[in-house]
């Protein structure tokens, strides 16, 4: 295996129904994680450049793990922002990352609004849909 995506793909093939991750509210199998990560990666691939940071404003959860893998599929790297950080610290991180967008879930949109972040918001829920294997393979080959 060469990277974390190869590991995920192989785990989904070998153990499709085995629980990959769980939190207090939900669990996800390897096959479900693989599919959701590819859906997220396919959607994000048209929104980010390869090597671009993708700030994530969410608590750690199964959804966050899906998003982490999806960002890697899209060719970016994820930066999990601590939701408890003060606004000035978060703005400094965003400036350092030179990112104009932030990904969150509908569940955290009000908390994000309170931080008054000057970024385009992408909702995790909007990233689910179809998988573009051609696009993902193209990114993986770079």
Short names for language-model regions:
Residues 1-142:
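Carrier-protein-dependent adenylate-forming modules in NRPS/ANL systems
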């Amino acid at each position: 295996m060469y990277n974390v995506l190869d590991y995920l793909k192989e785990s989904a093939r070998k153990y499709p129904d085995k629980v990959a991750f769980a939190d207090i509210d939900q669990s996800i199998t390897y096959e479900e994680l693989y599919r959701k990560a590819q859906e997220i990666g396919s959607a994000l691939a048209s929104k980010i450049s390869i090597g671009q940071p993708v700030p994530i404003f969410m608590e750690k959860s199964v959804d966050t793990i899906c998003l982490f893998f999806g960002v890697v599929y899209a060719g970016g790297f994820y930066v999990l922002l601590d939701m408890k950080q003060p606004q000035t610290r978060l703005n400094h991180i965003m400036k350092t990352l030179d990112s104009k967008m932030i990904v969150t879930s509908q569940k955290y949109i009000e908390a994000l609004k309170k931080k008054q972040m000057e970024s385009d918001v992408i909702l995790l829920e909007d990233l689910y849909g179809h998988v573009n294997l051609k696009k993902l393979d193209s990114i993986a080959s770079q």
